[in-house]
Regions:
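Non-transmembrane accessory domains of multi-pass membrane transporters/channels
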Residues: 30-99, 200-203
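Short, small-residue-biased leader/transition segments that mark boundaries at the very start
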Residues: 1-6
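Iron-sulfur-cluster electron-transfer modules
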Residues: 69-78, 113, 117-211
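Short cysteine clusters
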Residues: 81-87, 91, 105, 146-152, ...
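Juxtamembrane inter-helical linkers in multi-pass membrane proteins
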Residues: 14-44, 108-115, 175, 179
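Juxtamembrane segments of multi-pass membrane proteins
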Residues: 101-103
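Membrane-spanning helices that line or support transport/gating and their immediate boundary helices
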Residues: 10-17, 165-168
């Protein structure tokens, strides 16, 4: 409806104001995970000490499975999109025939958000419909087709960020469901064992100089 388009155009102003000004390609980290890693390398840290007030706690869920797990900015993005399609036109995955469409990611997020809101209004705040954004609206194939190139973010005239939603959905799959494409499983194993994506131990990294 025309009124919906006007509402989204009005939302463009606050959405642009609150857009991320950091260099594109710099992903945000999970504070709870970062704090745990820092503690591991701190010889003075007492693992049995009582947590201090204000200390980062373990989140209920890593990443996002449904719209309630997304940030408020991602939800604002969903309500701001006017469906112009510039993001999908610039997406290399979409251009090469992959299932991914950044425009659809945003539209699916908005549709799911409206569905959740309607369910809560009609059935109470604790109502669960046993559906989720990941799986019922956005497939695993879609989010793993993304190359994280930020072309969609760069092209959006109102600073919508579909990539943040994709990254949060991926984080859920990896950290909560342990679902990783086979192409990435080897890389993650190498990082765990060698501290780098390559299949070389840290002591052997400079061997190529002598060859």
């Amino acid at each position: 409806a025309a009124s919906d388009v006007y509402k989204r155009q009005v939302m463009a102003f606050p959405n642009t104001y609150f857009s991320n000004l950091n260099n594109k390609g710099a992903f945000n980290n999970l504070s709870s995970v970062k704090e745990e890693v820092l503690k591991m390398f701190d010889p003075s840290f007492d693992p049995y000490a009582t947590p201090t007030e204000g200390e980062a706690s373990v989140p209920d869920r890593f990443g996002a499975k449904d719209v309630e797990d997304l940030t408020w900015k991602s939800l604002m993005d969903a309500y701001t999109c006017t469906e112009c399609g510039r993001c999908t036109s610039a997406c290399p995955a979409s251009q090469t025939g992959k299932l991914l469409s950044p425009r659809k990611i945003i539209m699916d997020t908005r549709d799911r958000l409206e569905e959740v809101g309607a369910n809560k209004r009609n059935n109470g705040p604790d109502f669960k419909d046993n559906k989720s954004l990941l799986g019922d609206y956005i497939s695993e194939e879609e989010i793993w087709a993304c190359t994280s190139c930020n072309a969609c973010v760069q092209e959006c005239p109102v600073s919508i960020d579909p990539l943040s939603i994709i990254i949060d959905l991926r984080r859920y799959l990896v950290m909560e469901e342990s679902k990783v494409p086979s192409e990435l499983a080897g890389m993650l194993t190498n990082i765990e064992n060698n501290g780098a994506p390559g299949q070389f131990a840290q002591a052997d990294r400079n061997n190529w100089v002598d060859e």
